């Protein structure tokens, strides 16, 4: 049993299930939710929270992506794939969200000594514990050729199925992961490759954008050779929390948190419009 998980999970955890809100649930709302949770948990007004979320056919761009020379052509290409496009309020590059991708946010208070690496390791250990039978196969290292590459890409046999990011604001930490549960990892990667082809168009860029190789990405269903869906992977997450001492609470947001959420959502939406209009 992971000591890191035991240390952070053996306490009451609130669980928010945002996996079945449907196509009208916007990805911008998720970033507003996590900023809200960071704020209230950072002030010790709410317990640590696991939030599970699913969005339909959306590509989330990083701020650097939004400054590519032919960004409007890139966005039009994504719309041609029937995907909405937003720019997120934190670092990283383009990622795909759809009904076969489960996102998990572990939101907790930023305690002294809880480093950036500790945040990444906490999520990595959670995923390894969820898929205990495959623990030895799951690696955390950058997968060159994947979209949104990073040192905590999770892969099996060199094929990436998940990426971890982290946001720290107002005394709270949100460690977020997207898990490609079902569908084709390569097809998602081909769409992002098309985006970069159109948005870069052979012109100089201010950052090194990823050269996408679709064969470097796959879903858990493809990698494990058996069908998985969002619901059964979420159940694994909840069971793993309980196995490490968490008592799960199913309270919704408090009245104060709803007010905060509305403020965060308005701010994030306005910022997103500005970034897409530049």
Curated annotation (Swiss-Prot):
Its signal peptide is: none
Cross-referenced InterPro entries, in alphabetical order? aa-tRNA-synth_II/BPL/LPL (IPR045864), BPL_LPL_catalytic (IPR004143), LipL (IPR024897), Octanoyltrans_LipM/LipL (IPR050664)
Q: Give the EC number(s) under which this enzyme is classified.
A: 2.3.1.204
Which domain of life does the UniProt lineage start with?
Answer: Bacteria
The protein's GO terms of the molecular function aspect are:
lipoyl(octanoyl) transferase activity
Q: Which reaction does it catalyse?
A: N(6)-octanoyl-L-lysyl-[glycine-cleavage complex H protein] + L-lysyl-[lipoyl-carrier protein] = N(6)-octanoyl-L-lysyl-[lipoyl-carrier protein] + L-lysyl-[glycine-cleavage complex H protein]
Quote the protein name from its UniProt record: Octanoyl-[GcvH]:protein N-octanoyltransferase
């Amino acid at each position: 049993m992971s000591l890191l998980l035991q240390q952070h999970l053996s306490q009451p955890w609130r669980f928010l299930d945002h996996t079945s809100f449907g196509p009208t649930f916007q990805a911008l709302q998720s970033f507003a939710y996590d900023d809200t949770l960071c704020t209230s948990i950072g002030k010790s007004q709410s317990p640590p929270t696991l939030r599970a979320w699913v969005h339909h056919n959306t590509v989330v761009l990083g701020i650097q992506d939004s400054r590519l020379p032919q960004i409007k052509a890139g966005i039009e290409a994504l719309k041609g794939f029937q995907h909405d496009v937003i720019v997120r309020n934190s670092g990283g590059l383009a990622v795909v969200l759809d009904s076969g991708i489960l996102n998990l946010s572990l939101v907790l208070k930023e305690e002294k000594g809880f480093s950036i690496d500790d945040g990444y390791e906490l999520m990595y250990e959670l995923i390894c514990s969820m898929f205990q039978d495959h623990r030895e196969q799951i690696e955390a290292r950058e997968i060159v050729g994947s979209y949104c590459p990073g040192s905590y890409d999770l892969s099996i046999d060199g094929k990436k199925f998940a990426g971890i990011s982290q946001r720290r604001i107002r005394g709270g930490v949100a460690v977020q992961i997207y898990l490609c549960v079902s569908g084709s990892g390569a097809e998602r990667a081909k769409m992002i490759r098309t985006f970069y082809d159109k948005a870069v168009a052979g012109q100089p860029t201010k950052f090194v954008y990823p050269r996408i190789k679709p064969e470097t990405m796959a879903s858990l269903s493809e990698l494990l050779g058996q069908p998985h869906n969002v619901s059964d992977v979420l159940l694994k997450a909840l069971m793993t929390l309980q196995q490490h001492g968490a008592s799960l609470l199913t309270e919704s947001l408090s009245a104060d948190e709803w007010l905060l959420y509305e403020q965060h959502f308005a701010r994030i939406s306005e910022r997103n419009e500005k970034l897409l209009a530049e």
